[in-house]
Amino acid sequence: MKLVEKVTEMGLQIEMICPDHGIIWRKDPSKIINAYVEWSKQVPKRKAIVIYDTMWRSTETMAKAIADTLALEGVDAKPMHLRRCHKSDIITEVLDTAAVIIGSPTLNNHIFPSIGSFLTYMEGLKPAKKIAAAFGSYGWSGEAVKTINSHFETMGFDIIDPGLRVKYVPDKTGIEACQEFAKKIAHAIPA
């Protein structure tokens, strides 16, 4: 923001944006400058992103139940599978979202590797003003939720629920737990 303000004060006519990394903007650079100004403000919308990965589709079933319930509660909810969506696309969604909800199966007493990698990536970008919640499926130990919450704490997110864990495949009771979890998140998102 400070650099944008400084350039604006100088009255420079910007014709092109050439970053160290990324695409070169030759047309309408003011469009991207305005987008960066909005992104840097990190003003959250009534929106939730449900980021997840899954081994045997149990965590995916949870993610879909959570996203569907959020939508029914009037929240713009977007489920994003980490191995099907590029991390840059996911981070772009994180920029203006109010709630970051991450789901992971427990694998060898840890989070799924793709989730760990993404959390490290997100921590480096320092998103702010987020509420957060973790969920996941497990077979015998279930540490993934606790590990995700630890990352949320590091990022300064407001954890609104200790997390939802479902053993094995979500049955009717598990789906209902996902729905209640989502309703709690929806009520925590400012209107």
Predicted regions and their residues:
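Short acidic-aromatic active-site loops that bind/stabilize oxyanions
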Residues: Y52-W56, D171
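Conserved beta-strand elements of the Class I
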Residues: K47-I51, A133
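C-terminal accessory/connector segments of nucleic-acid motor ATPases
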Residues: I14, Q42, Y52-D53
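Interdomain/boundary linker segments immediately adjacent to catalytic/signaling cores
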Residues: P29-I33
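Membrane-embedded alpha-helical bundles that constitute the cytochrome b-like, heme-associated redox core
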Residues: N34-S40, Q179
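FMN-binding flavodoxin-like domain, especially the glycine-rich phosphate-binding loop
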Residues: M1-I24, A65-L82, I90-A191
